[in-house]
Amino acid sequence: MDQPVMDCPVTLVIKAPNQKYDDQTINCFLDWTVEKLKSHLSKVYPSKPLAKDQRLVYSGKLLLDHLLLKDVLRKQDEYHMVHLVCASRTPPSSPKASTSNKSMGTASISRSSSEHSGSASPASIRQDTSSTYPDPRPGDSIRHRHTSLMYNNLVHSHPFSYLRQEYALNPPPGQASPSTFPAYSAFTPLQMMWWQQLYARQYYIYSQATASNQSPSNGENAQPVPRPVINSESPPPNPPRAPPNVAPEMNPNIQMNAQGGPVMNEEDINRDWLDWMYTVSRAAILLSIVYFYSSFSRFVMVMGAMILVYMHQAGWFPLLQDEGQQHARDNAAEVNPDHVNNNDPQELEHRMDEGLQEEHNNNAGGNVVARRGVLASAWSFITTFFTSLIPEGPPQGAN
């Protein structure tokens, strides 16, 4: 029963993992061993692999040499797929590799001939390359031509292109001048654009730093140097006298509105009943404290002092304000004596006459000035003392 089964052939489909060869169909018998199958493959397989370099894999298992095919193959399958893996020590040379070697040899021969001639140009090299490697499609030739033009523009516009030109024209001493400079650089067009942007940015930063370092020195040098005064024989003519400032003095404490006029104190005009109640309550508390914790005479004195302070703040005593403005004008005249020095001789004589008259009047009015100074000092002391007793409200916000 087993002998007919052993004699019937089975079909094996040999598959190569690298897909270099097509699937090979081989007929064999079940009583063959794996070693005998390998020896048969070394004769009929296209690559003629050696038996010791073959590895057979069936259903994910490596087949050993001593196994029989009847013990390994499944009987219900009509075709048995076997994978052949060869560890070839001398792989066969493919026709594509030989073609590429020939083309590389042709390109190297053309390049060496151009170097020996010394008159080859990048255009001729590109023509040789294009003739060696023909374009499969016309669209690729147009794209290649556009890429080469863009590359040439980038090479010539690169900031370091002048270095290559200078090196080609004037080589360093001790070195022979090269016949031709390399037509192609190691950088791609995108890298060349990136280098160009980086160079422009570094140059811009350097120019800004240089300008910032030179600006203070230029400012210092621009300061005028005082020239020595040269005594001339004829004195310069007198400059025209400036007209006297006849403009009336303005109140320095006036508040200006944002629209261009004096600020109207709206708090005094539009004060509601709550503000008046708050003011009256503060005054009543102060007066009650003085009335209950002191005598009647002190209460009257405090009332009178408060009334005087209120009248002074309301502007009922303009004499003291006029004296303060007069002192301010006198101080301004002392600070600016240049106006007096620039006057004419006639005006100087007029001022001297006025000074003599003032000396005569000073003797008569000395007592009045002294008495007025004592009264002003006493008044300022009293007002300062009593105003310090009255608490001040919060500062008003500026309009």
UniProtKB/Swiss-Prot annotation:
Residues 88-144, 211-250 are annotated as: Disordered. The chain crosses the membrane at residues 299-319. This is Homocysteine-responsive endoplasmic reticulum-resident ubiquitin-like domain member 2 protein. It comes from Xenopus tropicalis. Residues 234-246 have a biased composition (Pro residues). One of its GO terms (cellular component) is membrane. Could be involved in the unfolded protein response (UPR) pathway. PROSITE patterns: UBIQUITIN_2. Keywords: Membrane, Transmembrane, Transmembrane helix, Unfolded protein response. One of its GO terms (biological process) is response to unfolded protein. It comes from the Eukaryota. Its main location: membrane. It is a single-pass membrane protein. Residues 95-106, 211-221 have a biased composition (Polar residues). It is found in: Membrane. The keyword Transmembrane helix applies. Residues 107-124 have a biased composition (Low complexity). It holds the Pfam family ubiquitin. The keyword Transcription does not apply. Residues 10-89 form the Ubiquitin-like domain.
